[in-house]
């Protein structure tokens, strides 16, 4: 019996699929799930991929055998096409989300598919957001795809040439989906208004409101249906039609509920960084959890933490950068969901670390001087003296080798003449910089002694 697409976009594989027109979507499922096309005739857009005899149409009609990677923007129909392929072929359907599945889950699904194949059952394996899989997770699929233990249908919003390992690319067809046109989106919205699976005309929607939904969707059918659903709920509660004003009042709520690509996404990222910088570890964990639950790319979070480690902590807590880099490496090596713990670990470490922006201000001051033209000649004794003729130019003459001094530090001019005695790095008195400040004073006193 084919297995179902869950209401949570494949969060729970192995749920039996109900028969009938709705592809397993319950009445309480989000509008975008209830309105998922149940046949090719209901698919809107992607005509370039669904022409007669095309690889994708053959798959959906049950005659294709090649694994595919569906590459396209959010809301363009990748999940829908995966479900249609399974339904049309009558094969077992297994679904994994790269956000929640690790190598263990991948191998378990493949093993179940091997057993099913012994009984003549072939399996369609759908992997949502495959670009979030680590190399190890992707490698675990190779043998099963090559020997057709599973027919892989993978979806990604990122260019697979950069996010999917080469051996998996070579074993799959790459099919690029295009954003829906305005007319495509309008057709999706109107169907949801009219169809009993959707609103079933239970609430009136002004034509101007439909226009606004199409505009806000920007080619993303799911975004349009999410906004429509929230607006319809508000309109029904107030006993009014869905107007432009209803849409405008509801769109922020819709973004918070379902959308990780709009303004709310950037607000949460900003709040996360500012909470870590502000040392509020609990708020930082809250915003981290919101990003993870919303499906934020863990690599993006790791990159932000690495930047913050130098920008807002620096030498006050030198281990912060090591922890942030280790977290990024862990994300790349093991992927999700296990890497969630590593991101939390790094977030806690950075939020509780002593803070300093002295590295940031030091580099900014040095670069401002360069832009202002303060880039004088390198002192002659510091210039390269290893080539023939260097000595005749005075290069490296009089250079003092620091290791010849018992303290490893000598009095010597290092900056150009224009920048002698300029202090760029000004450590704070916090964390590791408390000790550095005293040491730096001593170093500068030795180095800047009167030069002969």
Curated annotation (Swiss-Prot):
SMART domains named in the record: AAA
GO biological process: DNA synthesis involved in DNA repair; DNA-templated DNA replication
Keywords assigned: ATP-binding, Nucleotide-binding
GO molecular function: ATP binding; ATP hydrolysis activity; DNA binding; enzyme activator activity; single-stranded DNA helicase activity
InterPro entries per UniProt: AAA+_ATPase, AAA_assoc_2, AAA_ATPase_RarA/MGS1/WRNIP1, ATPase_AAA_core, DNA_pol3_clamp-load_cplx_C, MgsA_C, P-loop_NTPase
Family to which the UniProt record says this protein belongs: Belongs to the AAA ATPase family. RarA/MGS1/WRNIP1 subfamily.
Protein name per Swiss-Prot or TrEMBL: Uncharacterized AAA domain-containing protein MT2636
Annotated organism of origin: Mycobacterium tuberculosis (strain CDC 1551 / Oshkosh)
